[in-house]
Amino acid sequence: MYCLGGLTFLFFVLLVITGMMLAMYYKPSAAGAYDSVQEISTVVRYGWLIRGVHFYAANGMLIAAILHMLRVYFTGAYKKPRELNWVVGVGLGTLTLMAGFTGYVLRWDQEAVGAQGIGLGLASSIPGLGTIVTSIFWGNYDETIGHFFVGHVLLIPAVLILLMVFHFWMIRSHGIAEPL
């Protein structure tokens, strides 16, 4: 019951390793993205395995993070003096969802193109920030997929790592909350 945070971190490490391998062959352009994903799956040696591990680790990380947050919430482990750690954890959960969305779009097939339109449409409805977020990601197809690629491969993981370090430091300084 108390290993869900560690399991989430293990999935993240797997995602970083397999993501670096996939990034060597992926082409973030509207013309080459789908073909490069097909090439990774069929031509690159063990590409199907690397892509599969990345896919299942992403799903595992999302499930483990949600279960971890539910456990923290229902056991009351977010209470004083751990409120800031809870806020950081919610930020980590939000970034995990963002990483999943940006990774889904990188396949650049019909589903991904439709999903990015819906996702950016939802993002544009955020009061105050919506137009800024949408203007950053939306452009022509090459710009859009490039922005999602940079977000998925560089920005989101960098912020995730920084918040994880802070999250772990807070756990070390406050200790693990006692069970009910």
Predicted ranges, named:
Residues 1-180:
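Membrane-embedded alpha-helical bundles that constitute the cytochrome b-like, heme-associated redox core
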